[in-house]
């Protein structure tokens, strides 16, 4: 199922001609360092194969940082035991772009400030306890320019072919 496996998502995106960062799927915590050596790309991020909101996403500048994390009590395994190692593509302005689709049609693109980490759910800005004026001045999430037409069409076609309604 594409909706619960990032590995399958990346494979299908690549098969459809949509480029994704270099990614390796690793089964088991004990295999991560060796897989990272073979991938040999830094900086890199780790992420859970099955998770959302940026859970499990960590950035590493070098092998020493990765090894310290993997061998520490802070390491969190994905529910399926698969950790993804992925080349980190640093956004020029420090903001990650995420596009949302409903019924296989483009809805909007949001620009997200990732300087505080990768747990990036826009709904988190609406947590109880925040006052409305705090939300008004938040720069963390901003609706931004839409995808270029060619890229939007490629994603819409991918979603249609994969029969995914919401992405």
PLM region spans:
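Active-site nucleotide/adenylate-binding loops and adjacent lid/helix of ATP-dependent enzymes
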Residues: 2-95, 152
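Phosphate-binding site of ATP-dependent enzymes
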Residues: 58-158, 162
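Conserved active-site loop/cleft motifs that coordinate metal ions or position small ligands
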Residues: 166-167
């Amino acid at each position: 199922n594409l909706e619960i496996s990032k590995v399958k998502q990346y494979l299908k995106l690549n098969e459809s001609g949509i480029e994704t960062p270099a990614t390796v799927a690793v089964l088991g915590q004990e295999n991560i360092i060796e897989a990272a050596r073979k991938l040999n790309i830094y900086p890199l991020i780790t992420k859970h194969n099955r998770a959302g909101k940026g859970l499990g996403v960590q950035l590493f500048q070098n092998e020493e940082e990765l090894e310290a994390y993997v061998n520490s009590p802070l390491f969190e395994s994905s529910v399926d035991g698969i950790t993804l190692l992925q080349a980190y593509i640093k956004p020029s302005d420090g903001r990650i772009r995420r596009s949302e689709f409903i019924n296989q049609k483009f809805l909007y693109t949001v620009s997200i400030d990732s300087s505080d980490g990768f747990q990036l759910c826009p709904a988190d800005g609406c947590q109880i306890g925040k006052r409305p004026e705090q939300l008004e001045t938040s720069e963390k999430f901003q609706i931004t320019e839409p995808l270029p037409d060619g890229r939007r069409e490629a994603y819409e076609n991918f979603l249609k072919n994969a029969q995914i309604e919401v992405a």
